[in-house]
């Protein structure tokens, strides 16, 4: 039976008189939720109802999270992809040098791309971006290690372009976005740049397309004062999703 009278007020209280559920009315509303109990072996349901297609918006407070079974529920939002230097390749023209550098025997070897201090050099990689990506801008961080104790600034840049089925791959990259990180002063120390500004992917990014990336060191820029090779260990790409999965 639909309860029309008496009308429920703005809240429902528990047996102690404390608020259990707060209710907010919307003028001329057409969408609502339906609560259904269930027989043995079945789960009760909370269903959005009203118009033909209605989302269900559950909003936690402050830094709270949506939970299921006591654990946070994964929702659409900011995600990361890690690209190690071993998954990149030096550009045919002015390519960075792919190297394997030993620290101490039986300790971690470093798979790196060496970017020169005096010449702009490039490396490339590609990703078939997840279907859940919102096709918006990206950001990135560079993970690297210095080849000297110099503490000058090192400038890295990243640019990208998306290609669909039957598109030519002989296409110009999008506008580069740079990030600057100062040498830490100790050889073989781990360095992680700050997160870059927004990188716009050229082309017409869409689900299922392959995105090509070009990473470079802007060694010829006046602001790049790091006087040795910058040894890139990898790049972390940040992207935003607008779907819970890639179905």
Model-derived segments and spans:
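Short carbohydrate-recognition loop motifs
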Residues: 103-118
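Short coil-to-beta strand junction motifs in C2/discoidin
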Residues: 150-157, 228-232
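Extracellular carbohydrate recognition and processing domains
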Residues: 168-203
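A short beta-strand element within beta-rich, extracytoplasmic domains
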Residues: 136-146, 154
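Proprotein-processing/basic-patch segments
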Residues: 217-247
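Beta-strand-rich, repetitive solenoid scaffolds
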Residues: 2-6, 10-16, 20-51, 55-61, ...
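Cysteine-clustered segments with highest specificity for TGF-beta superfamily mature ligands
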Residues: 191-222
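Short beta-strands within extracellular/lumenal beta-sheet-rich domains
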Residues: 116-132, 137
């Amino acid at each position: 039976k639909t309860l029309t009278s008496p009308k429920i007020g703005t809240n429902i209280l528990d047996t102690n008189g404390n608020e259990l559920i707060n209710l907010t009315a919307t003028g001329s509303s057409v969408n609502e939720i339906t609560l259904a109990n269930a027989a043995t072996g079945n789960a009760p349901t909370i269903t959005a109802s009203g118009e033909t297609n209605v989302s269900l918006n559950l909003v936690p407070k402050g830094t709270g999270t949506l939970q299921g079974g006591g654990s946070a529920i994964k929702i659409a939002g900011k995600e990361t992809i890690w690209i190690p230097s071993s998954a990149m390749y030096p550009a045919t023209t002015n390519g960075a040098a792919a190297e394997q550098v030993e620290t101490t025997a039986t300790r971690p070897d470093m798979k790196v791309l060496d970017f020169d201090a005096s010449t702009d050099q490039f490396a490339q990689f590609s990703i078939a971006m997840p279907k859940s990506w919102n096709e918006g801008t990206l950001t990135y961080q560079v993970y690297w290690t210095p080849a000297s104790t110099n503490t000058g600034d090192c400038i890295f840049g990243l640019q990208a372009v998306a290609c669909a089925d039957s598109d030519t791959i002989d296409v110009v990259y999008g506008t580069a976005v740079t990030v600057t990180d100062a040498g830490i002063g100790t050889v073989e120390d781990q360095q992680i740049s700050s997160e870059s500004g927004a990188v716009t992917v050229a082309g017409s990014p869409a689900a299922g397309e392959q995105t090509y990336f070009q990473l470079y060191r802007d060694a010829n820029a006046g602001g790049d004062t790091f006087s040795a090779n910058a040894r890139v260990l990898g790049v972390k790409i940040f992207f935003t999703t607008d779907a819970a999965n890639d179905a």
